[in-house]
């Protein structure tokens, strides 16, 4: 026994607990916990029964309402003996009538909400092509497939056309025209501003141009010779074999081996200087080199944009074929004062 427990206050006023040992107190604690759990469970079960009673009554009322029309239809009685819903509702209390009326109103609302979802017509343009790819569908959906495929193809064509307009800055009056008529409308109504690159909206640079491969003297000689043969006729090999050998030797491509020797540029500024350049000399060399690049760029621009001569006689052409097509059609303009050529500061 513990002597210090005599002054301990017990809320339950059970003084016998002070005389119990530790094991006995633990057993009492276990029993008390078990009793508390059982009583709490009993209270919860009682509350559930109380809550389920109104629901059971309401369920009985609904079942009675459903069975009432069936019984009235089976018994072929007169119109005065048939019970309507209003007559049935008068047999119950006011609370029950309100609850049944609310349930009936909710059911009607559910039907009205679901009706638009069921009767909504599907959008034919948003249907996937994979829906028509099943062999189980047969030939019934053939017309739908054609309409859907035509819609998809037109949408792709319109997307490509819009991308081309954004790229070239084209604004057509008839946006519904297809891509073959796109360039015709541009030619009739619009001119491209070649003071800057219409594709990049920036100043021209040297890399926007490339040498024309059709301008080589050998190919030009071949074209002239073919034009001459078309008018006069080719000579026979037996009589003019020596002439044909000479022509074949002239038309060979050995001249392309040293093509860069014919177009050699001058030495860059400061190339022959033996000592290191000063700051002023370095800046002057940079300005001179930038001026050389500017002259080359302008020369290439003048050659590529000259539509008065045929394309095969232009020494330089644009690297983008779209620009060459615009030059051939003549739907562009530029001025020497507004021409922008990139110059590094």
From Swiss-Prot:
Q: How is it modified after translation?
A: Phosphorylated forms accumulate periodically during the unperturbed cell cycle and in response to DNA damage in G2. Phosphorylated by MEC1 and TEL1. Mutagenesis experiments showed that several of the 5 residues located in canonical (S/T)Q motifs, which are favored for phosphorylation by ATM/ATR kinases (Ser-73, Thr-90, Ser-249, Thr-279 and Ser-289) may be phosphorylated. Phosphorylated at Ser-267 by CDC28 which is required to initiate meiotic DSB resection by allowing SPO11 removal from DSB ends.
Where does the record place the region Disordered? 265-290
GO BP annotations of the record are: DNA catabolic process; DNA double-strand break processing; DNA double-strand break processing involved in repair via synthesis-dependent strand annealing; gene conversion at mating-type locus; meiotic DNA double-strand break formation; meiotic DNA double-strand break processing; telomere maintenance; telomeric 3' overhang formation
The reply on keyword DNA repair is yes
Keyword annotations from UniProtKB, A to Z: Cytoplasm, DNA damage, DNA repair, DNA-binding, Endonuclease, Hydrolase, Meiosis, Nuclease, Nucleus, Phosphoprotein
Effect on the protein of changing residue 279 to A: Reduces DNA damage-induced phosphorylation. Abolishes DNA damage-induced phosphorylation and function in DNA repair
Q: Where is this region: DNA-binding?
A: 21-172
**Cell compartment(s), UniProt:** Cytoplasm; Nucleus
Source organism superkingdom: Eukaryota
Q: Give additional notes from the record.
A: Present with 1030 molecules/cell in log phase SD medium.
- Describe its assembly: Dimer or multimer. Interacts with MRE11.
Protein name per UniProt: DNA endonuclease SAE2
> Which organism is the protein's source?
Saccharomyces cerevisiae (strain ATCC 204508 / S288c)
């Amino acid at each position: 026994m513990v002597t210090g427990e005599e002054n301990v206050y017990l809320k339950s006023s059970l003084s016998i607990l002070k005389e119990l040992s530790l094991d006995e107190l633990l057993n009492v604690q276990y029993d008390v916990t078990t009793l508390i759990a059982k009583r709490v469970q009993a209270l919860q079960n009682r509350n559930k029964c109380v809550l389920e009673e109104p629901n059971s009554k309401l369920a009985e009322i609904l079942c009675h309402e459903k069975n009432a029309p069936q019984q009235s239809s089976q018994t072929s009685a007169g119109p005065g003996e048939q019970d309507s819903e209003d007559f049935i509702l008068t047999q119950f209390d006011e609370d029950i009538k309100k609850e049944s009326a609310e349930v009936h109103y909710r059911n009607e609302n559910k039907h009205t909400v679901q009706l638009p979802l069921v009767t909504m017509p599907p959008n034919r343009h948003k249907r996937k092509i994979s829906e028509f790819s099943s062999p189980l569908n047969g030939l019934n959906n053939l017309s739908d497939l054609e309409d859907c495929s035509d819609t998809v193809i037109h949408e792709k064509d319109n997307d490509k056309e819009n991308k081309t307009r954004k790229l070239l800055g084209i604004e057509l009056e008839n946006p519904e025209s297809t891509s073959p008529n796109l360039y015709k409308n541009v030619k009739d109504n619009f001119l491209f501003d070649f003071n800057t690159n219409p594709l990049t909206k920036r100043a021209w640079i040297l890399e926007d141009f490339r040498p024309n491969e059709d301008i080589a003297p050998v190919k030009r000689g071949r074209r002239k010779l073919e034009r001459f043969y078309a008018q006069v006729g080719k000579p026979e090999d037996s009589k003019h074999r020596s002439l044909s050998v000479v022509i074949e030797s002239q038309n060979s491509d050995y001249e392309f081996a040293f093509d860069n020797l014919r177009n050699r540029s001058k030495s860059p500024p400061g190339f022959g200087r033996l000592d290191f350049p000063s700051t002023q000399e370095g800046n002057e060399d940079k300005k001179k080199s930038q001026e050389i690049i500017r002259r080359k760029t302008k020369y290439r621009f003048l050659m590529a944009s000259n539509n008065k001569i045929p394309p095969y006689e232009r020494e330089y052409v644009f690297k983008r074929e779209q620009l060459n097509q615009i030059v051939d059609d003549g739907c562009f303009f530029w001025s020497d004062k507004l021409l922008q050529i990139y110059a590094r500061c």
